[in-house]
């Protein structure tokens, strides 16, 4: 689960991570009031008006601007709220700005990058720091890897003090700035582990002219599988920032990702789903979605899966690819038949069922009287999809 910058900063503040003073605003009037309050409380000469969307690259797209007065903050907010912000992470459709973060300005002396995430190759959390603050960390890793330090964290011991100090040394900090950076990194790691985050990224981390180490921006992503342990954070979810198809799928515990093709896919198991999309592509088609109905697919989940696939008007054919291990193919076949009858399917539906009770399932489909196309293997299924689209 992704959350907004201001929400992430509110969480980090509770763990002792230093963040600027800021106030969220939902209108130009609220932005003006927030600016007046920040000017009065901080003595800053400027405030920063920041669009709140679930995407990076906001500054280059005009989503981060400075205001030297409450009136200027009002005018910027008036133009920004309701605008569609297009960045390299939003795609060409962009995201509509519905809220802003009004934040105190900072006298920036240095900019760095600090992030913590899970390294799946080593099954360990990794602390990453870079002297290239404000840059995409993927670009830094590819073009100037010598400017990026990765520190593997032993899950048995957690991050140790010497590792936080190693990171601060790498950034070239000394004296009070060094001590502040060590404390910052330690607090960030505590927050990351305590809330079961999948990503805690500060970009940029800045050192101010007063020597303070502050998170100028913050990205916090939660591990969905651990959210049941943090129900207080579930209310932070902003479904308006998510694809409506994916939101609907999550209500039925379906793992769905919308793509831009025309072949709807319904598969059980993430690995098989990715393999299915690959072979559709190899056969000349384009998958319209990733849809994993899970290892215990039932007639109900199959029916819900069809509803979600068919809600995408770009879909011109559907491929159902089920391997029956725990799940019984005859139960899935029952779900396919029920869905086909209820929804009056007019699109070609190619079905490949293998595994437990596959022969029974095949017989059920053959005798159903429905125009379902049976496939004998994955390659045959992909070929039949292409024939149906021709």
From Swiss-Prot:
The gene is sucC. GO terms for cellular component: cytosol; succinate-CoA ligase complex. Mg(2+) binds at residues 203, 217. Its EC number is 6.2.1.5. It catalyses: succinate + ATP + CoA = succinyl-CoA + ADP + phosphate; GTP + succinate + CoA = succinyl-CoA + GDP + phosphate. Belongs to the succinate/malate CoA ligase beta subunit family. Binds 1 Mg(2+) ion per subunit. This is Succinate--CoA ligase [ADP-forming] subunit beta. GO terms for molecular function: ATP binding; magnesium ion binding; succinate-CoA ligase (ADP-forming) activity; succinate-CoA ligase (GDP-forming) activity. Heterotetramer of two alpha and two beta subunits. It comes from Chlorobium chlorochromatii (strain CaD3). InterPro entries: ATP-grasp (IPR011761), ATP-grasp_succ-CoA_synth-type (IPR013650), ATP_grasp_subdomain_1 (IPR013815), Succ-CoA_synthase_bsu_CS (IPR017866), SUCC_ACL_C (IPR005811), Succ_CoA_ligase-like_bsu (IPR005809), Succinyl-CoA_synth-like (IPR016102). Substrate binds at residues 268, 325-327. Keywords: ATP-binding, Ligase, Magnesium, Metal-binding, Nucleotide-binding, Tricarboxylic acid cycle. Its cofactor is Mg(2+). ATP binds at residues 50, 57-59, 103, 106, 111. The keyword Ribosomal protein does not apply.
């Amino acid at each position: 689960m992704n959350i907004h910058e201001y929400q992430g900063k509110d969480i980090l503040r509770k763990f002792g991570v230093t963040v600027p003073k800021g106030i969220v605003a939902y209108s130009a009037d609220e932005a003006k009031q927030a600016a007046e309050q920040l000017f009065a409380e901080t003595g800053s000469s400027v405030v920063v008006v920041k669009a709140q969307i679930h995407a990076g690259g906001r500054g280059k797209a005009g989503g981060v601007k400075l205001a030297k007065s409450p009136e200027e903050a009002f005018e910027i907010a008036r133009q920004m709220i309701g605008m569609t912000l297009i960045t390299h992470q939003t795609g060409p459709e962009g995201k509509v700005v519905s809220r802003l973060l009004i934040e105190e300005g900072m006298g920036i002396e240095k900019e760095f990058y600090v992030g913590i995430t899970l390294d799946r190759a080593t099954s360990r959390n990794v602390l990453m720091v870079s002297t290239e603050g404000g840059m995409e960390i993927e670009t830094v890793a590819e073009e100037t890897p010598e400017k990026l330090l990765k520190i593997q964290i032993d899950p048995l011991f957690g991050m140790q003090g010497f590792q936080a100090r190693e990171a601060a040394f790498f950034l070239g900090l000394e004296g009070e700035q060094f001590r502040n950076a060590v404390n910052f990194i330690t607090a960030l790691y505590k927050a990351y582990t305590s809330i079961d985050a999948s990503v805690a990224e500060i970009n940029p981390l800045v050192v101010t002219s007063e020597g303070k180490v502050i998170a100028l921006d913050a990205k916090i992503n939660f591990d969905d599988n651990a959210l049941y342990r943090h129900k207080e954070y579930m209310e932070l979810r902003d479904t308006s920032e998510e694809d409506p198809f994916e939101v609907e799928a999550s209500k039925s515990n379906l793992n769905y990702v919308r793509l831009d093709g025309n072949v709807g896919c319904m598969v059980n198991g993430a690995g098989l789903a990715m393999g299915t999309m690959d072979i559709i592509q190899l056969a000349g088609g384009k998958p319209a979605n990733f849809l994993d109905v899970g290892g215990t697919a039932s007639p109900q989940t199959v029916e819900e899966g069809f509803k979600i696939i068919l809600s995408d008007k770009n879909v011109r054919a559907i491929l159902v690819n089920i391997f029956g291990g725990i799940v019984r193919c005859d139960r899935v076949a029952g779900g396919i038949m029920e869905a086909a009858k209820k929804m009056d399917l007019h699109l070609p539906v190619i079905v490949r069922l293998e595994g437990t009770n596959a022969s029974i399932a095949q017989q059920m489909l053959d005798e159903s009287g429905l125009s379902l196309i049976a496939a004998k293997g994955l390659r045959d299924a992909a070929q039949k999809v292409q024939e149906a689209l021709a």
